[in-house]
Amino acid sequence: MKNFKYYFVMMVLLVFGTLPAYAADKEGDQSHKHGTWQEKRFVAAVDADGIQRAEMVGGDYFYDPNYIIVKVNIPVELKIKKSAGYVPHNLIAKAPEAGIDFNIDLKGDPQTIKFTPTKIGKYPIYCDKSLLWFKTHREKGMEGLIEVVE
């Protein structure tokens, strides 16, 4: 009987503990399904010190901007921070062949990612976080591109 009470209490806590995240998950899902997601481009200019700089915010199933254009073979500093909220997010790019390879958990304070793109092309960025059995944040629209141009 003790075990039953323990497991019952644990199940209740689990269910009610995940409801807020489930609601946030569904809300983000609906906004993406209804087409509110839109591409937001940013072209990084080369500063006087020879570095391309861009700033990005990641939040509930979005990156802003979500499409960053940089020049090949010129160092990039991408400053990113997480908007307010309790849902964890990250920023991933997996293109080591192009000098773009990072996986960073987003925080409220800005973090700087440094890389030098070495190959022209379009490279996906995304968040792979998810809660239990729900869709990943990428599947819910938290993705974008880094485009490397001449």
Predicted regions and their residues:
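Bacterial N-terminal signal peptides that target proteins for export
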Residues: 1-8
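Bacterial N-terminal signal peptides
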Residues: 9-18
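Boundary at the C-terminal end of the N-terminal hydrophobic targeting segment
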Residues: 21-25
